[in-house]
Amino acid sequence: MNINDNLSINSPVDNKNVVVVRARKTDTVFKAFKVAPNIWVAPERYYGESLSIDEEYKVDGGIYDSNFLSQDSEKDKFLQAIITLLKRINSTNAGEKLLSLISTAIPFPYGYIGGGYYAPNMITFGSAPKSNKKLNSLISSTIPFPYAGYRETNYLSSEDNKSFYASNIVIFGPGANIVENNTVFYKKEDAENGMGTMTEIWFQPFLTYKYDEFYIDPAIELIKCLIKSLYFLYGIKPSDDLVIPYRLRSELENIEYSQLNIVDLLVSGGIDPKFINTDPYWFTDNYFSNAKKVFEDHRNIYETEIEGNNAIGNDIKLRLKQKFRININDIWELNLNYFSKEFSIMMPDRFNNALKHFYRKQYYKIDYPENYSINGFVNGQINAQLSLSDRNQDIINKPEEIINLLNGNNVSLMRSNIYGDGLKSTVDDFYSNYKIPYNRAYEYHFNNSNDSSLDNVNIGVIDNIPEIIDVNPYKENCDKFSPVQKITSTREINTNIPWPINYLQAQNTNNEKFSLSSDFVEVVSSKDKSLVYSFLSNVMFYLDSIKDNSPIDTDKKYYLWLREIFRNYSFDITATQEINTNCGINKVVTWFGKALNILNTSDSFVEEFQNLGAISLINKKENLSMPIIESYEIPNDMLGLPLNDLNEKLFNIYSKNTAYFKKIYYNFLDQWWTQYYSQYFDLICMAKRSVLAQETLIKRIIQKKLSYLIGNSNISSDNLALMNLTTTNTLRDISNESQIAMNNVDSFLNNAAICVFESNIYPKFISFMEQCINNINIKTKEFIQKCTNINEDEKLQLINQNVFNSLDFEFLNIQNMKSLFSSETALLIKEETWPYELVLYAFKEPGNNVIGDASGKNTSIEYSKDIGLVYGINSDALYLNGSNQSISFSNDFFENGLTNSFSIYFWLRNLGKDTIKSKLIGSKEDNCGWEIYFQDTGLVFNMIDSNGNEKNIYLSDVSNNSWHYITISVDRLKEQLLIFIDDNLVANESIKEILNIYSSNIISLLSENNPSYIEGLTILNKPTTSQEVLSNYFEVLNNSYIRDSNEERLEYNKTYQLYNYVFSDKPICEVKQNNNIYLTINNTNNLNLQASKFKLLSINPNKQYVQKLDEVIISVLDNMEKYIDISEDNRLQLIDNKNNAKKMIISNDIFISNCLTLSYNGKYICLSMKDENHNWMICNNDMSKYLYLWSFK
């Protein structure tokens, strides 16, 4: 789809792409710009809301500014920002299909007859008399278009109401609250009855916020609004009252449920629908069946009355045709989770609104195109350099609760705010009142495939549909917009026991001069608020231990200090403790109790947790509500049925009961998810905020120290500049350690939630299920016993076939349930921590060799065009022939420093014999960094820091012309250097003396004097363990090994029989002919032909297993050992002299793993066509593929 980007606020009105139109039901006019067919942008505040809002109606977290978007310069920036976002959405196939569908999905037109209008659910009268027979006939037959008249509802009208412009959506600026995005319908009735109605979107493109470590992408926020617009355009909007319980909010005696609108649930996607809406769907409502019916009704009207009606323009018909190419389920399955993957956008996996209660959003400014382009954030979602908005000071502060922490004298120590989640709440227990229906069919089946629901959207066809120029307007196409305003109140709670929110607040400070303290009471009692609560015991001990030391006045002292701050922070924040439990929790985050006063403990959290169990971490511990169920009574009219008919009907009932058990199961599952897991999720969120608060404190301490040295020390400007760069990288490394801590929290609390389910919920559930099953079994047996037309044996047969003998249902299996929970709850909100910084690949194209990086880090690569490729250990390898060839990899991730751990591994085959020093790979600047080079027939790994401290490790035994797997692991936390050759640890050295190795962001792979093969060069941002080295080494080797017929590794010097793939039951034998011995299959059942015994001989005598592209000699064991040669007629023959034997290349088959190929001089060894009584082994490339395949048994 073409997005019109040739527009500005000053573009002249042309009544085509730039128009002045009237807002619905008002006298307001605005300038609108058509950016795509039926898609308009109005760079104005939304007209439907007053920009002057009384304080009591302002919502918590909102920002109100009546002057926003009032200047033409702002309006132009808004227009360009929306165009940029639409172009970004349009840049992927999925996004282009979404926009094409929105452009096409026009509301259903109204029928017109003699001054009256008709829609399937509505008729109004103009001047036509009511006795008109044709009109009455129309009404009774419900045919909307007998006379080909129609009126359209999707249009904008000019100021004088004489010109009309087709429109499906209009994107405005925000309404009164400038940080609220919204999607509103034009006409409520048509939004729900299948007719469809156009949509208005309010949108704020200039402000975003952070979620964990990444910024929310405005493109995904706009996609959310666009998806919602389809519900209005198709007329399938559900009732506003269709809500489901989302999470329990339980504080002291107050218990409320947050409720989530069904559209928000469907559109958000992610984890929530997998539990709340898992098929079969236990929560039934008429919405799904009714919406599907009105959708099908209108598609049927289109197909029968419009598609073939030549009096209706193609601009209308073709759009309706494309609109109805998709099914209603396709719309229900459009969600942000799908689009986030299509755009590689990070987003929360749970509905965003439910995350606001534990912290306050801070908004960041987005400047287009400086910070954001059609490719997204210029520096990525995590590293985007966005400034905090000045508007944060205007955020409305209306907490849901205020927690007053009082001391023993009832003096207030602190006030902490708990904010709402933006959702409606209710005190009604949905589950205790909801009756699970028995006979209702499943309302909606989710599509579990990975296929796009937009597959039926044909972009090419849609692009060629003529635009709607002449609009026949239906004047009653809209309702007056009525904004919903509500008054919110705040309740206050007094407590002497600190709540988690109190502890969380104590970890934040605005004081520039602060000190860390582990004494919470001391912190909240301090008069000047200079103390900040921290649970980082190692950090505080270190800071206390050096307070009397001499001041830091050199770069080396600063590096030593900075390194220790980093190491101690890492030890504190990533600390866990192994424990033993009966339900799978084997690791506890030790600081969790200290951070949030969980269990009201200090150092004894782990012990208390072991004593009280995982249930002790949350407030609600009551039993789940037993669902109200219906039971199916077997009708008495079945008593007289013949045996077969009776058995069939009883089996149908049996199947219905099984499905009903599933409904009960999902009801329990949903209660657990809503009432129990939601509380653990709250703890996860608060614990992560605590991690980020501690991280912020440590970073402020570091930045304060660096600022002081920059302004007050005698350190040279060059060294200060280097210290500044190094500190930036260390701050990044601190964030990485925080992410590890947050992952630990995820794992711990998710496991705790699963433990509660297994220990507290599942037994009650199974007990209830047993009651249900027993009751059904009793009724079934009683009914069968009452059947008088069958004998006792037949009754027993029916009982055995139609009663439930046990709870042996797959969906009741606890292990299956735990696997489901583990897969869906692990790492719910995480930064995508892909550890690979460089993954080198190479492959051949016709006339060109391609070298690239598969890490996804957008590495810039420059390389000599004459670098050759050869087949390596497992794929194409680089051939550096020693003629000053080079490859340069550039990426900010490659910058080293003081605290970053990293690993390097690659496969190397050294072809050189020289002893002269020859560089291989490195990252150095101003003689600082790391490097690997050849020297004295070995390999040297060198590290040198900015202060001249150096470490050199010499590695021998890599110059024997064989492949070796080189792994180098630099662990800055353990101050340890590990080096492996193949699967052997050859160096374990301390690097405590090595400080800052800051170097450029370039890694160079060189070939100065030494020819070599390099394959699989990989750089990781973490150290590598011995177990990982072994795993990597043998994984690659396993892929490269040739396999025998049993999939075992083929061995040198081991005796085998040889078979051809085509004749897999006939071994290769020896046949004498003309004083020569040739090889053939025994296809005559000649008992004198015995299977030959083969042995593979390696060129390398130390090699045990055969690998791809090895050169091999094949010997045949007879009375004396013979060797394979190739005769003049290309047959394989046996000779006595090993020196004259042919060296063949052995490889495996990609598709048949236990088969191999043999080749000589580029020709394959194959089996000939039958020659008299023989199929000879020959060297020839003209045979069928499968005749080239061999197998050793």
Swiss-Prot record:
Assembles with botulinum neurotoxin type A (BoNT/A) and protects it against pH-mediated inactivation or protease activity at pH 2.6 (the pH of the animal gastrointestinal tract) but not at pH 6.0. Necessary for neurotoxicity. Residues 830-1193 are annotated as: C-heavy chain nHC. It comes from the Bacteria. GO terms for molecular function: metalloendopeptidase activity; zinc ion binding. Pfam families: NTNH_C, Peptidase_M27, Toxin_BN_H, Toxin_R_bind_N. This is Non-toxic nonhemagglutinin type A. One of its GO terms (cellular component) is extracellular region. Forms a highly interlocked heterodimer with botulinum neurotoxin type A at pH 6.0 but not at pH 7.5, called the minimally functional progenitor toxin complex (M-PTC) (BoNT/A, botA). The record marks 133-134 as: Cleaved during long-term storage, protected in M-PTC complex. Has 3 domains that are structurally very similar to those in BoNT/A; light chain (nLC, equivalent to the light chain, residues 1-408), N-heavy chain (nHN, residues 409-829) and C-heavy chain (nHC, residues 830-1193). Residues 409-829 are annotated as: N-heavy chain nHN. GO terms for biological process: proteolysis. Belongs to the botulism non-toxic nonhemagglutinin family. SUPFAM superfamilies: Clostridium neurotoxins, 'coiled-coil' domain (SSF58091), Concanavalin A-like lectins/glucanases (SSF49899), Metalloproteases ('zincins'), catalytic domain (SSF55486). The 133-Lys-|-Lys-134 bond is cleaved during long-term storage; the cleavage site is masked in the M-PTC complex. InterPro entries: Bot/tetX_LC, Clostridium_toxin_transloc, ConA-like_dom_sf, Nontoxic_nonhemagglutn_C, Toxin_rcpt-bd_N.
